[in-house]
Amino acid sequence: MFQDNPLLAQLKQQLHSQTPRAEGVVKATEKGFGFLEVDAQKSYFIPPPQMKKVMHGDRIVAVIHTEKERESAEPEELIEPFLTRFVGKVQGKNDRLSIVPDHPLLKDAIPCRAARGVQHEFKEGDWAVAEMRRHPLKGDRSFYADLTQYITFADDHFVPWWVTLARHNLEKEAPNGVATEMLDEGLERQDLTALNFVTIDSASTEDMDDALYAEELADGRLQLTVAIADPTAWIAEGSKLDNAAKIRAFTNYLPGFNIPMLPRELSDDLCSLRANEVRPALACRMIISADGTIDDDIAFFAATIESKAKLAYDNVSDWLENNGTWQPDNEGIAQQIRLLHRICLSRSEWRHHHALVFKDRPDYRFVLGEKGEVLDIVAEPRRIANRIVEESMIAANLCAARVLRDKLGFGIYNVHTGFDPANADALAALLKTHGLHVDAEEVLTLEGFCKLRRELDAQPSGFLDSRIRRFQSFAEISTEPGPHFGLGLEAYATWTSPIRKYGDMINHRLLKAVIKGEAIARPQEDITQQMAERRRLNRMAERDVGDWLYARFLNDKAGTNTRFAAEIIDVSRGGMRVRLVDNGAIAFIPAPFLHAVHDELVCSQENGTVQIKGETVYKVTDVIDVTIAEVRMETRSIIARPAA
């Protein structure tokens, strides 16, 4: 009798509309209960039984109940699940399989089975890719997943690499394909094979992109010719190889090995500017005045070159610093190193005054054994030879940016607009509290940004610099010419790494059109989006593999008194993040390790400081001594504590 009662339906509807609800993101805890985080200020308690319906990270709508003045959330509707495609470890065997997602806050095993078409017979400990199929808030009884791809077995030494690449859905190997002959591009190539071009790279590099040649002109000015490997002489636009490179967008450099954008036959051989091998190249010739200014008379042209020496950064740096036993093979090579050194110094001086120069940070290199074990982690400081190459590449990219802008009006540009205009007033207010006065309007211009950066670089510590970083915008890839505030340049377009960056291949094709005086279409916007997305994924993959290897490397230091110098890089409510100076590992120091009495401790992310009893004890950029308290292998996290 009540079934179709309109009054009852109306009452139900009324009750439903009067019940308070909230939308937010589920945050799990290790204790079984959770919270519905609505915004930074408001969250609701989710009791353990209700947590069984949801997963950490799910965006949901929940009904809010109030009992004895305590509010709690009952999940009602799923807006967006946290897990869709994920990687994890398989448990059980045969017909009763489950998978534990590889995520620090997801501990529960999810029942699963192999998807149709997946041949592998899964067993305990296998790593797999899975896709969620059922969710309790979707009307299903429980969570359920399909195993869509086998990654590797439990004890594979190379788990960090294979699991990370599968997690980010990235390629595991070089693309297939061969280039049999060079294309007829209708380009006249200048024969520069007699000139003493040299390459300077790491000793182990095989994919040499760039070769340099310098000479002194009669009036004392220096002429630099930058010759760049020419993969577009082999790869036609729209071909199979070109499309594969477009998808990859970059060579993926991971600790221990790389996954190239082009087939290795091209990247490490046919295109690589190997010593004593004749190679096609795209070249740029520029004249540099004594004060480091690049003259307007810039020439781009196609060439044939033959590198006369494969030089290594450390050898060249040692020789210039009068250290070590290494000597150039002959006076011609020695003369090249001297001239390139002079160009480096004058360009560096010019950039100090007219643009911006990054502070040098060391590169950290993992030394790996046959089985992927970490034998050592070496900090490699950026030395004078690195800077010679860097200054030459920045100069060449600046030339390309100008030529593409003036001749075509488009290209693949790296654009960085400095500070987000919405943050300008807050930035000026923050700087004022530290005694620096800037105009909120002026700081949004390239000149104003450079002026502020130089003032910050002159500060005794990097503390203030670290505080304003959150106000900065991100660098972008754009087809429209625009300034690069981070480099302090009016425009910047890279073309010097076409073996490893697809955007540089595009700029090669555009520059060749300029050389031939031909019209060419503007690159599609979706290409810049693909490049930005791939750059993000490659960086995450490099970080993930690094975290795994750091955890392996420091595992035997946990609980010992071994001290490490560590720079504080971030403060949050829960503690501090530090970077170990000698090897680059990131570790977390929980707040209770900083001070035992909770009420006397204030960790402020806003100020980048830790105060104990009102006194600032730690701040971002401080370097302190720490010991390793614990290494959690399952989450690849390193927990440190200040050394006693």
UniProtKB/Swiss-Prot annotation:
Residue ranges of every copy of the S1 motif domain listed in the record: 561-643
RNB domain: residues covered: 189-516
Top-rank lineage group of the source organism: Bacteria
Family: Belongs to the RNR ribonuclease family. RNase II subfamily.
Alphabetical GO biological process terms: mRNA catabolic process
KW Signal (keyword) present: no
InterPro entries noted in UniProt: CSD, NA-bd_OB-fold, RNase_B_OB_dom, RNase_II, RNase_II/R, RNase_II/R_CS, RNase_II/RNase_R, RNR_Ribonuclease
Major localisation: cytoplasm
Catalysed reactions, semicolon-separated: Exonucleolytic cleavage in the 3'- to 5'-direction to yield nucleoside 5'-phosphates
EC number, UniProt record: 3.1.13.1
Cellular component, GO annotation: cytosol
SMART domains for this protein: CSP (SM00357), RNB (SM00955)
Name of the protein this chain belongs to: Exoribonuclease 2
Localisation: Cytoplasm
Record keywords, A-Z: Cytoplasm, Exonuclease, Hydrolase, Nuclease, RNA-binding
Its biological purpose: Involved in mRNA degradation. Hydrolyzes single-stranded polyribonucleotides processively in the 3' to 5' direction.
